[in-house]
């Protein structure tokens, strides 16, 4: 199993990867997909949870939809295949967009 992808990392380590961001905050990442289809397709995206002191989440950021599929699993597959470097780039864009 390749732990350089989001899905691989989660399988190998049994937890989501965490990143430091340009805003000085720590974030973990999760994926999500629509519960119901829109126009026959499901969207999938990344959800970044911002952590405060201790173990309490204090906010979140999310990407726009990154992939679509006929099922939630089909939509999630390309998101889970993203490299951790690509995931970090999405986090950096979300942080920049949030502070603009």
Question: What are the roles of these predicted feature ranges?
Answer:
Residues 11, 19-20, 49-51, 56-59, ...:
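Charge-rich alpha-helical segments
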Residues 18, 22, 40-42, 82:
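Broad hydrophobic/π-residue packing in well-ordered secondary structure
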Residues 29-66:
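A short, structured beta-strand/loop element
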Residues 2-3, 23, 34-38, 64, ...:
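Acidic-enriched, low-complexity/disordered segments with a strong bias for Aspartate over Glutamate
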Residues 1, 10, 29, 46-48, ...:
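Generic hydrophobic secondary-structure signal
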Residues 59-100:
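Short, compact, well-ordered microdomains
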Residues 1-28:
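Negatively charged, low-complexity tracts enriched in Asp/Glu with abundant Ser/Thr
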């Amino acid at each position: 199993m390749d732990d350089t992808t989001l899905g691989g990392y989660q399988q190998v380590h049994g937890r989501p990867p965490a990143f430091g961001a340009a805003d000085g905050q720590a974030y973990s990442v999760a994926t999500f997909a629509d519960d119901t289809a829109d126009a026959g397709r499901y969207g999938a995206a990344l959800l970044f949870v911002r952590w405060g002191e201790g173990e309490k989440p204090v906010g979140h950021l999310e990407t726009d939809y990154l992939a679509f599929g006929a099922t939630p699993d089909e939509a999630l597959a390309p998101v889970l295949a993203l490299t951790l470097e690509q995931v970090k780039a999405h986090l950096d864009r979300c942080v920049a967009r949030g502070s603009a």
